[in-house]
C-alpha cells in the first residue's frame, strides 16, 4: 500500500467482532484490522499471548472493540459507510449485541496502518501443540509444537479470538491420522491449516467469499502442506465425498441453516465442531442439532462464546 488511505471503523463489542469483520470482507477493502481489549487486559503478557492490536485499545479498559477496514481514496467512502451502517443495523435487529455500533472514517497514511500494527502481532500458542505465527516473525518450535504460518493482513481470523481458539482445541482432540476434514467458511484458512498440521489425511476449505478463498490459498502456500483444497461455493455444491469432521466457525443462525447439509456431508459417527455462538443462541443450536439426529458431546465456553461438538448418530 502506498500513499493515503481511508480507515472505516466500527466501534463494537468483542462478541460482534467476527460478523462485523465479515461485513468488511464482503467489500473490496485492502485490509482489515481487529482490536479487542479483552485479548490483552487481564492476561500475563508474553511473546505468545499477543494478537495484533493497536496499543491504544488499552485505553478502552475492555469496554469496546474495534474493526477497521482500509480503502483507497478512489473508493466512494460515503457509499461504504452507508453500507456498513446498514449491515451493522441488521446485526442489531438479529439480536446480536454490537455495543455502540458506531461507524467512523478517517484519512490515514500508509505508515499508520501498513507497518505500525505489525509490531503488536506476535506468535500465539493455542493448547500444547499449535502456534499461529505471522509470516514476518521468527519462531523456533520446541517439542511437539506445530507452527501455522499466517498473513493476518488478509486473514479473517488470527487465532486468538475465543471462537477460533476453541475450534483449534477441538480439532486437536478429534483429528486423527486418517481423518478427512471439511472447513466451512474457511476465511483465512486457519482451521484447515490446523487440521492439516495435526495430521488429517485430507482437508477441504470452502467459502462463499472469493476474497477469503484467495486469502486461504495464499496462507496455505506459506505452509509446507499438500493435502488442502480450497473451493469457492456452498458445501454440498462443490465438495465430493464425505468427511469425518466438519468444522464451522460462523454465527449461530447460519449454523442452524447448514445443519442439514452438514448431516449429508458427514460419515456415520462423524463429528461437527461449530463455534461463533453467543450464549443467547446456544440452546437454539443445540435444539437444531438434536432435531437433525446429532448427539451433543461437548459445550465449551470461552468469554461470551460457545463451541459445540456433536456426533452424527
From Swiss-Prot:
GO annotations of cellular component type: cytoplasm
Matching InterPro entries: Ribosomal_L11_MeTrfase_PrmA (IPR050078), Ribosomal_PrmA_MeTrfase (IPR004498), SAM-dependent_MTases_sf (IPR029063)
Record-linked SUPFAM superfamilies: S-adenosyl-L-methionine-dependent methyltransferases
Source organism phylogeny: Bacteria, Bacillati, Bacillota, Clostridia, Eubacteriales
EC number: 2.1.1.-
Name used for this protein in its record: Ribosomal protein L11 methyltransferase
Entry binding sites for S-adenosyl-L-methionine: 164, 185, 207, 249
Keyword Disulfide bond: no
UniProt xrefs under Pfam families: PrmA
Family to which this protein belongs: Belongs to the methyltransferase superfamily. PrmA family.
Amino acid at each position: 500500500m502506498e500513499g493515503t488511505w481511508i480507515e472505516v471503523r466500527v466501534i463494537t463489542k468483542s462478541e460482534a467482532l467476527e460478523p462485523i469483520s465479515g461485513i468488511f470482507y464482503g467489500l473490496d477493502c485492502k485490509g482489515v484490522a481487529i482490536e479487542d481489549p479483552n485479548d490483552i487486559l487481564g492476561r500475563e503478557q508474553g511473546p505468545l499471548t499477543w494478537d495484533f492490536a493497536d496499543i491504544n485499545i488499552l485505553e478502552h479498559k475492555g469496554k469496546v472493540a474495534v474493526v477497521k477496514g482500509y480503502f483507497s481514496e478512489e473508493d466512494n467512502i460515503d457509499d461504504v459507510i452507508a453500507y456498513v451502517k446498514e449491515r451493522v443495523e441488521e446485526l442489531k435487529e438479529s439480536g446480536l449485541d454490537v455495543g455502540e455500533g458506531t461507524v467512523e472514517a478517517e484519512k490515514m497514511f500508509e505508515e499508520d496502518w501498513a507497518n505500525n500494527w505489525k509490531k503488536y502481532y506476535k506468535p500465539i500458542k493455542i493448547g500444547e501443540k499449535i502456534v499461529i505465527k505471522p509470516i514476518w516473525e521468527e519462531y523456533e518450535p520446541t517439542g511437539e509444537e506445530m507452527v501455522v504460518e499466517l498473513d493476518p493482513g488478509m486473514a479473517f481470523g488470527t487465532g486468538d479470538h475465543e471462537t477460533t481458539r476453541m475450534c483449534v482445541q477441538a480439532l486437536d482432540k478429534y483429528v486423527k491420522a486418517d481423518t478427512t476434514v471439511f472447513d466451512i467458511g474457511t476465511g483465512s484458512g486457519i482451521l484447515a491449516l490446523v487440521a492439516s498440521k495435526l495430521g488429517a489425511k485430507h482437508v477441504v476449505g470452502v467459502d462463499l467469499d472469493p476474497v477469503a478463498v484467495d486469502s486461504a490459498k495464499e496462507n496455505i502456500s506459506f505452509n509446507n502442506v499438500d493435502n488442502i483444497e480450497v473451493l469457492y461455493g456452498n458445501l454440498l455444491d462443490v465438495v465430493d465425498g464425505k468427511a469425518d469432521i466438519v468444522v464451522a466457525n460462523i454465527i449461530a443462525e447460519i449454523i442452524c441453516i447448514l445443519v442439514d447439509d452438514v448431516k449429508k456431508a458427514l460419515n456415520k459417527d462423524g463429528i461437527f465442531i461449530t463455534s461463533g455462538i453467543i450464549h443467547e443462541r446456544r440452546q437454539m443450536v443445540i435444539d437444531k442439532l438434536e432435531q437433525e439426529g446429532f448427539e451433543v458431546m461437548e459445550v465449551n465456553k470461552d468469554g461470551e462464546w460457545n463451541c459445540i461438538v456433536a456426533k452424527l448418530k
